[in-house]
């Protein structure tokens, strides 16, 4: 958690700006809105997320339970709680390397999405958000007219 806090503070001071900070399920979500890209990195209870749009100030809860990126990053928080300090070496560092070397597979996902630790985060998120918020990972992608499901973009 200390490393996640430090990374979030460093990111806000010297990297991309953090436009809002929200809390859900014991995790801190530091969001950079209108960033031009959608990506996230989670260390401990700190989920640092870049999004291409904005979140209405009073609607973070609804936004988070409808945006699979937020749910996926929360899955990493759950995984980190289970793995403790080993998370940094078994998930964190390998994930940074995988993301850097990722390439597209088909129309929906980069190769990074298929890494075991990414899929484990998706499974943990699917279980948590299904149990606590009624989210169905196999329903159509939220806020979209697409037939694709969350699982199509965030494989289990």
Regions found by a protein language model. Give the residues of each.
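Metalloprotease/metallohydrolase-associated module, dominated by Zn2+-dependent proteases
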Residues: 1-11, 15-17, 26-38, 42-44, ...
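Short pre-active-site segment immediately N-terminal to the catalytic Zn-binding motif
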Residues: 35-40, 47-71
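Short, solvent-exposed loop/turn segments at secondary-structure junctions
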Residues: 54-55, 75, 128
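Alpha-helix capping and helix-coil boundary motifs
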Residues: 62, 84-85, 104-108
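Solvent-exposed, acidic/flexible segments
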Residues: 63-71, 80, 114-118
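Catalytic Zn2+-binding segment of zinc metalloproteases
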Residues: 74-93
